[in-house]
Structure formats: structure tokens, C-alpha cells
């Protein structure tokens, strides 16, 4: 039986994951007290900001790293199914927020945009063809199209076909249900909704600086006002650390055992941004390529139409950039301060295991704009230097941890949920596809750490997310029904199954 006493929840960070969690808690338990602290002057400035991430609605429609080629040449699409389901769950929750009046004008943050996969070379073409065959036979992806015809590709992505002839070996697949998501705008809308809640207190320019665990299991959270310098202490039954790159240092300050043998390595992304409106207007899709052999998923190149502040723009990247800061607005001492006696062997083991990744990162850092432009020309052969500017986007901190399966110093890709044994501290670490799957991550947090409330919360969660507790992978009828409804709620295009 759940304890019906009001609880105090402290949320650290005002990014997409924190505001998603806060939006859920205020509906599940309206009487609970929520205190949300953000060290900067407004929400969604760091990784969630629309200029600091790729803005892709990651649904595994075009991202080739979610479909893995097996030794026999067949393609495993299980990860793609999982990612697609998670994004559909996110869309359901966003649709609920719109219908309930918590947020408005969904086109401010989500727009329909076809997703295309593009490859060159005989082996890559064979891979894409096999992927197409595997995906088109599964209901989630049965609207996928495939071509090796340059004239068809000219219709799909005319900008990328300029200057090409039919002699080049290349192929593309396309799914029209793709989206571009402005996670910064979505975050701002959710933060504004939380601010209006009578039992929520949202404070900007406030930085959590330390924690003290009390004998009764609750937490004293020390918070510094960055404007005045004043420090206050607030009590919390639950501490939710959703501070992006700042999560690992904060988790370490709690002193919980789960924070040991854990570290992070900061990587930022750079993008080329197009400044020529004529070029921008020739491309109205997201096109993902294939990552170079032996490189991590974050290296997948893509040429993306983006909608930022109501205007179309065009980005290409990412190019990795390394540095010691854990946040764009962080300190050059962040990495060094995160090295502790209890995690130094973890970090050193990771360095030894991942020398190719380190070399790749260094090569990327040394790459000039000319080198970046040469990469762009593999997508858009006639790209001109004067039409593009190099921009440094957000930071991501790759989680490094010890595991039974992989030993010491394993680099964890994706989003990692870490919680204390008593579930009073919850931290979200890692990176992509975090924003796209933020709702599924929040649900995982609820299920793992608030199990005593499951009976009371399940009907409420099913109202927010109609497929909650069911499988969109296994239930085709439910998948199509929820997809049709969310398309209506979010003002997206809906395509009947072929």
C-alpha cells in the first residue's frame, strides 16, 4: 500500500528529461511538493537546446546504427523496433500534454519531415537493400521505400544529387513519417507548465552544491543562489538528478555506493550550418549516412533540415570535439574534478580499451573547416565553403563504468539510469537517443523507484499514454491506432499502412 503522505521531490536541471519527469509527477501526485533548480537563467539551454543537438525524432527510420548486420548478411532490426516504440510512447505523452492544455501549439516543437538513409559503395548498398527487406515486412516500418535509381533520388533529395551522375553506386531508403523535434522549445513549454503548478517551485540561477543524508533517509540539499551567493538547505524525500553533463559530479557528491566505479568522458559535437537561403530551400528532409567502420554511433553523418525559432535551416555533422568541460557553460576543471580514488582505475582501463576511439576523437579535433567541408561534399558534392559556418553544439558525457559482462572501463552508449538502493536518489547519465526516448526513460524511473505507487499510478499513466503496459511491437492494431491518434494530436501527417 502506497504511503499517501505528501512527498518532497527535488529535481536538478531544467532539460528535457527533468521537465518530462516533473510533468509526470505533478499529474500523478498533485499534492507532492516539487522544487526544480536550474543553474542557468532559463530552461533548456544546455543539451536540450535546439542548437545543441540534432533535433531528430529518433524512431529508427533512417539511423543505420540501430539495424545491425549479422555474420550471415541478414539484418537484425530488434533494436530499431525498440527505439521506434519508445518514440511512439513519447509522442503519446506529448499528445496528452497538448490535449490536457498543459502545452499548446505542437508545431512549435514537432514538424513532419521525411527520414532518408543514404549510402554509397557496393557493400553498403547491399546492406541497405537487406535492411529494407527486413524492415518492410514489419508493420512499424512497412511504409519504407527503397531505390537505387538516381532520378528517384533526385525527387527525394535534389540538393544531394546535384553534380552526380548515374555511374556512382549508391542507394537510399525513405520513410515519410519522420519528424524534426525542437527539444528546446518542448522543454520550455513543459517547464512553463510546471511553473504554474501550485505545489511546484521552479528556481533559475540556482545551483545544487551538496547533499547530506539524514538518519531518517531523507536528504538535505544545499542550493546556492548564483545571483546573491546565498545558500539555503531544502529537504527532499526524492532527489532526481537530470543535469545532463553535470549529473556525474552531482551523483558523486551524494556519496551513494552506486556512484563509485563510474566516470565520464566529455565529447561535444560540431556542425556545419548553412547560411545560404537558396541552398536551405532545396533540402527538406533528414538524410542519415553510415558511420565509418570502427567508430561509435555518435559519428553517423547526417544532413538535416531543422526548424529553429520558426525558420528552416540546414545542418551537417556531427564532428566530434573533446575538451574537459562537462557542460557548454561548465568549467575546464570538470573532468579533472570527477577523477576520484574510487574511479581512476575505471577511467584508465577505459583509455587502454578505447585507443581507436581516442585517436578518432583527436583526429576530429584536429580537423579544419576544410576537412569538414570535404566530408559534407560526400553528401552534397557542390557545397561551397562560403555557404557554411562551423558551430560547436552541446556536450555529452559518455558514461564509463565497470560491468560483469565487459569488465572495467566499459563505455556505455545511450541513456543510463542510476539509483540508490533505497530509491531516494535517481540520476540520469549519458546521451542519445535520450531526448527522443525521454518519456520511456521517465517511465523506467517511475517503475524502478516508485513501485509502491504502481497500483494508484497505472490508471493515470494509461490515460497519459494509452499503450502503457502493452507492446506496440506485438500489438499491430494498437500501434496503428495510437500512431493515428498522436498524428492528430500533434498535427502530424498520418500515412496508412501500404
Curated annotation (Swiss-Prot):
Q: For this protein, what is the EC number?
A: 1.1.5.4
Q: Print the organism lineage.
A: Bacteria, Bacillati, Bacillota, Bacilli, Bacillales
**Does the keyword Oxidoreductase feature in the UniProt annotation?**
yes
The biological processes this protein is annotated with in GO are:
tricarboxylic acid cycle
Q: What is this protein called?
A: Probable malate:quinone oxidoreductase 2
Say which domain of life the source belongs to.
Bacteria
Pathway listed: Carbohydrate metabolism; tricarboxylic acid cycle; oxaloacetate from (S)-malate (quinone route): step 1/1
Protein family:
Belongs to the MQO family.
Q: What class of enzyme is it?
A: oxidoreductase
Q: Gene name?
A: mqo2
Task: Check the record and name the PANTHER family matching this protein.
Answer: L-2-HYDROXYGLUTARATE DEHYDROGENASE, MITOCHONDRIAL
Q: Which NCBIfam families match?
A: Lac_Quin_Ox_NO, mal_quin_oxido, PRK05257.2-1, PRK05257.3-2, PRK13339.1
Q: What molecular function terms (GO) are annotated for this protein?
A: 2-hydroxyglutarate dehydrogenase activity; L-malate dehydrogenase (quinone) activity
Reactions catalysed, semicolon-separated, are: (S)-malate + a quinone = a quinol + oxaloacetate
Q: Which cofactor does it need?
A: FAD
This protein's record includes keyword DNA repair: no
Q: A Pfam family this protein belongs to?
A: Mqo
Q: Which organism is it from?
A: Staphylococcus epidermidis (strain ATCC 12228 / FDA PCI 1200)
In terms of Gene3D superfamilies, this protein maps to: D-Amino Acid Oxidase, subunit A, domain 2, FAD/NAD(P)-binding domain
Q: Keyword set for this entry? A: FAD, Flavoprotein, Oxidoreductase, Tricarboxylic acid cycle
Amino acid at each position: 500500500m502506497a504511503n499517501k503522505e505528501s512527498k518532497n521531490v527535488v529535481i536538478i536541471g531544467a532539460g528535457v528529461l527533468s521537465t518530462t519527469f516533473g510533468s509526470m509527477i505533478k499529474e500523478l501526485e498533485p499534492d507532492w511538493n516539487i522544487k526544480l533548480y536550474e543553474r542557468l537563467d532559463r530552461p533548456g539551454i544546455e543539451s536540450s537546446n535546439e542548437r545543441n543537438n540534432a533535433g531528430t525524432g529518433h524512431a529508427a527510420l533512417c539511423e543505420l546504427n540501430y539495424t545491425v548486420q549479422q555474420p550471415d548478411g541478414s539484418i537484425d532490426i530488434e533494436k530499431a523496433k525498440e527505439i521506434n516504440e519508445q518514440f511512439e510512447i513519447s509522442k503519446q505523452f506529448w499528445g496528452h500534454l497538448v490535449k490536457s492544455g498543459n502545452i499548446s501549439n505542437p508545431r512549435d516543437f514537432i514538424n513532419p519531415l521525411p527520414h532518408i538513409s543514404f549510402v554509397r559503395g557496393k557493400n553498403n548498398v547491399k546492406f541497405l537493400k537487406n535492411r529494407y527487406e527486413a524492415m518492410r515486412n514489419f508493420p512499424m516500418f512497412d511504409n519504407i521505400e527503397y531505390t537505387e535509381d538516381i532520378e528517384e533520388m533526385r525527387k527525394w533529395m535534389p540538393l544531394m544529387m546535384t553534380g552526380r551522375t548515374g555511374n556512382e553506386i549508391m542507394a537510399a531508403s525513405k520513410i515519410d513519417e519522420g519528424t524534426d523535434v525542437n527539444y528546446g522549445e518542448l522543454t520550455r513549454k513543459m517547464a512553463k507548465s510546471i511553473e504554474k503548478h501550485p505545489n511546484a517551485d521552479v528556481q533559475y540561477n540556482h545551483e545544487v552544491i551538496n547533499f547530506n543524508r539524514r538518519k531518517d533517509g531523507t536528504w538535505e540539499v544545499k542550493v546556492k543562489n548564483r545571483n546573491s551567493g546565498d545558500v539555503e538547505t531544502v529537504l527532499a524525500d526524492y532527489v532526481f538528478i537530470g543535469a545532463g553533463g553535470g549529473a556525474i559530479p552531482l551523483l558523486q557528491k551524494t556519496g551513494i555506493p552506486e556512484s563509485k566505479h563510474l566516470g565520464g568522458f566529455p565529447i561535444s559535437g560540431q556542425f556545419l550550418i548553412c547560411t545560404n537561403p537558396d541552398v536551405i530551400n532545396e533540402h527538406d528532409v533528414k538524410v542519415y549516412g553510415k558511420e565509418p567502420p570502427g567508430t561509435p554511433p555518435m559519428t553517423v553523418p547526417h544532413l538535416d533540415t531543422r526548424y529553429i525559432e520558426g525558420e528552416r535551416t540546414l545542418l551537417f555533422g556531427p564532428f566530434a570535439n573533446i575538451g574537459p568541460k562537462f557542460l557548454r557553460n561548465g568549467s575546464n576543471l570538470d573532468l579533472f574534478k570527477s577523477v576520484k580514488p574510487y574511479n581512476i582505475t575505471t577511467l584508465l582501463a577505459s583509455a587502454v580499451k578505447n585507443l581507436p576511439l581516442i585517436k578518432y576523437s583527436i583526429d576530429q579535433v584536429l580537423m579544419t573547416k576544410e576537412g569538414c567541408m570535404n566530408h559534407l561534399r560526400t553528401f552534397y558534392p557542390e557545397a561551397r565553403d562560403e555557404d557554411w559556418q562551423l558551430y560547436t553544439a552541446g556536450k555529452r558525457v559518455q558514461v564509463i563504468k565497470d560491468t560483469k559482462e565487459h569488465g572495467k572501463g566499459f563505455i556505455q552508449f545511450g541513456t543510463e539510469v542510476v539509483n540508490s538502493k533505497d530509491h531516494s536518489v535517481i540520476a540520469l547519465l549519458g546521451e542519445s537517443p535520450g531526448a527522443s526516448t525521454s518519456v520511456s526513460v521517465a517511465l523506467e524511473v517511475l517503475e524502478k523507484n516508485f513501485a509502491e505507487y504502481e497500483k494508484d499510478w497505472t490508471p493515470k499513466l494509461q490515460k497519459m499514454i494509452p499503450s502503457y503496459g502493452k507492446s506496440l511491437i506485438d500489438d499491430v492494431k494498437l500501434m496503428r491506432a495510437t500512431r493515428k491518434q498522436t498524428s492528430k494530436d500533434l498535427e502530424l501527417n498520418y500515412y496508412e499502412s501500404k
